[in-house]
Amino acid sequence: VIVIDALGNGLSTSPSNSLAQPGARFPRIGIRDMVQSQRLLLDHLGIEKLHAVVGASMGGMQALQWAVSDPVRVQRVVAMTPMARTSRWSQLVNELGRRALFVDQACTQPRARADAMRLWVPLTQLIVPSSSEALEDFESATALGQWLSDKAAWFGEHGPDAYDWLAQTRAYDAHDLGATPGFAGDTNKALASIRAPALVLAPEIDLYNPGWSARAAAQAIPGARYLCIPSDRGHQAASGVKAGDVAWLDAQIAAFLSQ
């Protein structure tokens, strides 16, 4: 099992840890760049075949990119809550997140940390990744407000770095499998090139990566199987927040990988 931190996440090469190109000087990257860096790592390790590439959210988008970019190495692909081309809705969500973190439109001046987190946390940690049903878990409006305050304080101390968020969300926004060389911007043509058996999973309602986008991607991949995740957690259906969702996903993925 190989788990790789994507470029820009603050652990692999990122604006927050780059010595040569820190902060606003960090170059723009794309999801295809993330996958290419992972391919180079596997070349270095001498790994020629992957039994499966599995990912959720941006990881699911990377999984589909893997299947397009390296069809010889990828033997199976499991993409949870993915998009083959980033939706306008997702781009809007990311833009609102960036405006919460930065004072100026050019994204060169981060807001004061506490101010940024008061705006950023409700949007990115609760409203968008969750669902209206999930919010009913809070006993009262007071409990919800306290959760937001606690989360804002935690993120204010622990992250994210504003420039890391900027780099990754810009990569997110620019993603389109059709931009892979050889497909002339045709997303469906890129999806149709996937030869590995593919399993695509997404909940019915996802306020970050729309469920229709995952379904459309699955329909364009030859022989792909699409499964609707029976979850009320929205985008977090594939993030491990609910034990029942984890058990269901484990069973479906295990069955797929055993074929």
What do the PLM-derived regions correspond to, one by one?
Residues 151, 167-190:
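Active-site nucleophile elbow and catalytic-triad environment of alpha/beta-hydrolase enzymes
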Residues 73-155:
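Alpha/beta-hydrolase-fold enzymes
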Residues 207-213:
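Conserved alpha/beta-hydrolase "acid-adjacent" motif
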Residues 1-16:
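Conserved alpha/beta-hydrolase
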Residues 49-91:
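Conserved hydrolase catalytic core segment
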Residues 32-52:
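Conserved acidic catalytic loop of the alpha/beta-hydrolase fold
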Residues 194, 200-202:
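Short beta-strand/loop motif that positions the catalytic acidic residue
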Residues 215-218, 223-259:
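Catalytic active-site module of serine/aspartate enzymes centered on a nucleophile-bearing elbow/loop
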